[in-house]
Curated annotation (Swiss-Prot):
Involved in a signaling pathway that modulates root auxin transport and auxin gradients. Acts partially by positively regulating the auxin carrier PIN2 and AUX1. Acts, together with GB1 as positive regulator of meristem initiation and branching. GB1 and NDL2 positively regulate basipetal inflorescence auxin transport and modulate MAX2 expression in shoots, which regulates organ and lateral meristem formation by the establishment and maintenance of auxin gradients. InterPro entries: AB_hydrolase_fold, NDRG. The lineage of its organism: Eukaryota, Viridiplantae, Streptophyta, Embryophyta, Tracheophyta. It is found in: Cytoplasm. It comes from Arabidopsis thaliana (Mouse-ear cress). This is Protein NDL2. One of its GO terms (biological process) is response to abscisic acid.
């Protein structure tokens, strides 16, 4: 566990999500963690996708009043940034060793130890979802549950590996050029919000494009290399004992990956919710679709909206996933029943 001399605290009150950022020294290098909420509450850690940070991956979700009240009432949120993905991050030295996905998962343990956290709830998007799933498999006693958005769980297909290699080379030699931005935007969003010659880009895509322009391309390249070298987690998924709620956009490039992951999880613990008309970044594109499934999911841990009289400081004792997830109507979502999957 790091001592106080290993952390630099930065006042982030000006940021839209509030909280305070800590630069925590780990065996694998410094990692930026933004802490939002009451540290006496149970911990929720988040991990973003490639080239993004917590503000872009989870801002849309936390700006929904219902989601904000549900999560911030029950949790203290620890937003973990991959190396060099925080705002204003310097370029990582070219002499620094490349980290693997395993290294990034191990780094999370050091972060938890630094803050004195035990078992935590986890929320991740795509590459971040893979890192958190790997973390849950390696350190089962440190994970209460997983909320995954468009997760990866298999090794890259040849087409994905090649696409990532092209993007990796472009990042390394040309920086975050226009082609790289388009590849990443296609990764995150559906065609509807990306726009075309007749329909302008949505505000969230324009904001994301601006964010990508500010990224340190070498830092993004490092995270991409780690994810492109990932291994298949399929065989170990059934041994996961934590509850897992998976969201997948109907138009996500990783739709089949999420379905595959659900089939590999223990049927008692996993649920898949498909959100129609969304790309991979459901938490930004259609965050309101996540609220009711998350609410029922957290009920299994005795966690409720603020109107309930249950203390969020009480120990979490997970039960099975609520049966209400079986019914799209009860979730308030217009989902295709065959694509709304729950295993009890």
């Amino acid at each position: 566990m790091a001592d106080s001399s290993d952390s630099v605290s930065i006042d982030m009150e000006a940021l839209s999500l509030g909280g305070q950022e800590h630069l925590v020294e780990t065996t694998y290098g410094p990692v930026c963690v933004a802490v939002c909420g009451d540290p006496d509450k149970p911990a929720l850690i988040t991990y973003p996708d490639i080239a993004l940070n917590y503000m872009f991956c989870f801002q849309g979700l936390l700006f929904c009043p219902e989601a904000s009240s549900l999560l911030l009432h029950n949790f203290c949120i620890y937003h973990i940034s991959p190396l060099g993905h925080e705002l204003g991050a310097p370029m990582i030295s070219v002499d620094a060793p490349l980290l693997s996905a395993d290294d990034l998962a191990d780094q999370i343990v050091e972060v938890l130890n630094y803050f004195g956290l035990g078992a935590v709830m986890c929320m991740g998007v795509t590459a971040g979802a893979y890192i958190l799933t790997l973390f849950a498999m390696k350190y089962r006693q440190r994970v209460l549950g997983l909320i995954l958005v468009s997760p990866l769980c298999q090794a890259p297909s040849w087409s994905e590996w090649l696409c990532n290699k092209v993007m990796s080379n472009l990042l390394y030699y040309y920086g975050t050029c226009g082609v790289v931005k388009e590849m990443l935007l296609k990764r995150y969003f559906s065609k509807e919000v990306r726009g075309n010659g007749h329909v302008p880009e949505s505000d969230i895509v324009q904001e994301c494009r601006r964010l990508l322009s500010e990224r340190q391309s070498t830092n993004v390249w490092r995270f991409l290399e780690a994810i492109n070298g990932r291994v298949d987690l399929s065989e170990g998924l059934r041994k996961l004992q934590c509850r897992t709620l998976i969201f997948i956009g109907e138009n996500s490039a990783y739709h089949s990956e999420a379905v595959h992951m659900t089939t590999k999880l223990d049927r008692r613990y996993g649920a898949l919710v498909e959100v129609q008309g969304s790309g991979s970044l459901v938490s930004e594109e259609q965050p309101q679709a996540m609220i009711i499934p998350m609410e029922y999911f957290l009920m299994g841990y005795g966690l409720y909206r603020p109107t309930q009289s249950v203390s969020p400081r009480s120990p979490l004792s997970p039960t099975r996933i609520s049966p209400e997830l079986l019914s799209p109507e009860n979730m308030g979502l217009k989902l295709k029943p065959i694509k709304t999957r729950l295993a009890l």
